[in-house]
């Protein structure tokens, strides 16, 4: 009886079979999601799981094509930290545990900020255009799969631009995290949320400003310790 009351796991983001596509096409698409110049994205954030709730402000400084300095702070400076991400790897984080608790899935952080990491060299690349003839918004799907990990991306277009970017990470068939990002008229992130399967965790952010003329000082890439 108890088993019957358990909530069903969410359906896959992309519940349809996909065909292999050229890797170069996926790389070209991922490149279009990056800012053309170093950019600072300032946001309000909220995190909660089964045990805690936190909120505060943060800044993601992006140096395309693959580098990010991520700073966050809670109310009155409590719970502050920083990290540098290169591609899908954390170069350093301080405090390490706090950052990895806040954002345990780096590809999903990039996706939440409206940016897609290109497929790894050994990844299988699949895709589809789900546009139908009924006048519905165009939806384009990409899947990058390797070594038991699968990353699905679903981009919804309207009036010739992407307005919604969704992503899902599955490991050995089990969902790890799913993100949903609304984009503004310039296809930049406006708001986002990442839901994690473990512990009912959720990370949300609302963008308050985007500076496309920012200068990222070299010292910011170095560890704070």
Sequence positions of predicted segments:
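Hydrophobic lipid-interacting interfaces of membrane-associated proteins
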Residues: 44-50, 75-78, 90-97, 145-147, ...
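An acidic-aromatic
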Residues: 64-120
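Amphipathic hydrophobic-ligand
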Residues: 52-56, 79-84, 173-177
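Edge/loop elements at the starts and ends of beta-strands within beta-rich repeat scaffolds
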Residues: 32-39, 51-54, 61-66, 83, ...
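Surface-exposed beta-loop interaction hotspot
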Residues: 116-133
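Gly/Pro-enriched, hydrophobic low-complexity segments
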Residues: 128-225
């Amino acid at each position: 009886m108890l088993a019957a009351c358990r909530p069903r796991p969410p359906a896959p983001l992309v519940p349809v079979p996909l065909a292999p596509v050229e890797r170069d096409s996926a790389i070209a698409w991922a490149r279009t999601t990056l800012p053309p110049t170093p950019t600072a994205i300032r946001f309000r954030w909220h995190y909660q799981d089964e045990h805690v709730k936190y909120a505060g402000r943060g800044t993601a400084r992006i140096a395309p094509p693959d580098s990010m300095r991520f700073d966050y702070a809670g109310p009155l400076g409590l719970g502050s930290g920083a990290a540098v991400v290169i591609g899908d790897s954390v170069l350093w984080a301080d405090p390490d545990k706090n950052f990895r608790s806040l954002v345990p899935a780096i590809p999903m952080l990039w996706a939440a900020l409206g940016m897609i990491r290109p497929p790894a060299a050994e990844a299988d690349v699949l895709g589809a255009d789900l546009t139908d003839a009924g006048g519905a918004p165009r939806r384009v799907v990409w899947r990058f799969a390797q070594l038991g990990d699968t990353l699905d991306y679903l981009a919804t277009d309207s009036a010739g631009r992407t307005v919604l970017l969704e992503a899902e990470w599955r490991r050995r068939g089990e969902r790890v995290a799913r993100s949903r990002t609304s984009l503004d008229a310039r296809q930049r992130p406006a708001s986002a949320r990442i839901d994690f399967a473990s512990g009912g965790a959720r990370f949300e952010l609302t963008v308050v400003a985007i500076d496309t003329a920012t200068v990222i000082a070299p010292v910011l890439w170095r560890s704070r310790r």
